Structure formats: structure tokens, C-alpha cells
Amino acid sequence: KITSIVVSRPIFDNEQELFDLIDLKKDVDMLSTLAAGRLMRGDIRFLPATAGSVKNIIENLNINLTGKKALVIGRSPSVGSPIFWYLQKSNATVTLAHSKTKIEDLKKAAKDSDLVILAAGVQLLKPEDIKENAIIIDCGYNQDGQGDLSFIPENASYTPVPGGVGPVTTITLITNSLNLYHLFY
């Protein structure tokens, strides 16, 4: 009996069509249109694995998101957008930016944010762009093996790459699989 399906990425053509063929009961990475719709309607029990790992990191750090200013840089359906919906549902004030956001707007938003989630590309921010005591969660992984953060912040907390979000993402996939199994089987 097949109880979980994970699609290995990248897939270059018709990716969403493939995701939409997966039964919601077996969609461990929550990438179907139906899963996305549930998330947008406020159901944050299951998130795509990388977005879920960000949620797990935030919860394990005991961060109360209510009233916090958060910046999510990246709008992909598997990382940035689900993180945006999770943070919004958790009562943070969220700004969603991306690689096409004007750099001056991005820097201003980062300087004002208590929490910065990076998921859009390396070197968009510099040390002086980060608010003192901010928390930075780097979801990026680039060809050089590094994350989206090209510096080690002295005035903020951050997750390293490799070794930060990646291992938690693997655990989140397994947890999603077990939780879906217990919910539906």
C-alpha cells in the first residue's frame, strides 16, 4: 500500500500538473493546488517540507510571532509563499519580497524586520541591511553549497547553510508522512 508520495525536483515541464495528480492524503510535500488552497484558507497543519522546517525552527526557538515584523524574500510555491501564509496566520506583520523587488525597498524592509526568511537568491542583503537582534533563517542553497546569506551577521542570529534548514527539512518530510498516515489510514 502506498501511503506517501514525494516528487524529486527539479522537474522542468508541467511540474504543477504532476503535483496535482497526487492525492492530498499522500501529498507529503503539500505541493498540489488543493494543498496550497487549504494553506491559504488558514490550514497550517501541513506545510511543504522547507516551509515546514522554518515553522519548526521558529517553534523550537519559542519565538512568539504575534506583532513581530517579518520579511520573506522569495515567493516560490514550495518555500516563500507557504512561509508567508504561515507567518500571517501566526499574527506576524509580513512583507513578501522577491528577486524583482527594488533593492532599496528590500533593504528598508530588512532593516525594519525582526525576522528575515531568505529564499530567493544569494547576496540580496548586506550586513548593514539587517536590524540589530534580528533572526535570519536562510532557506537558500546555491551551486557553491552556500545559502542566500553571503556574510555572517554579527548583530543577529541566523541559521547556517549547510546544516540549518536542510536537515530539518528532511525531518519535516518524514513527520508530514507519519502525520498524514495517522490522519487518513
Task: List PLM regions with ranges.
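Short, small-residue-enriched loops and turns at beta-alpha junctions
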Residues: 10-13, 124, 143
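Conserved short-loop catalytic and cofactor-binding motifs
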Residues: 42, 75, 161, 165
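Glycine-rich phosphate/diphosphate-binding loop of Rossmann-like nucleotide-binding domains
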Residues: 1, 45-139, 146-153
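Anion-binding alpha/beta catalytic cores of soluble intermediary-metabolism enzymes, centered on
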Residues: 3-65, 107
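Rossmann-fold NAD(P)-binding glycine/threonine-rich loop
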Residues: 16-37, 132, 137-185
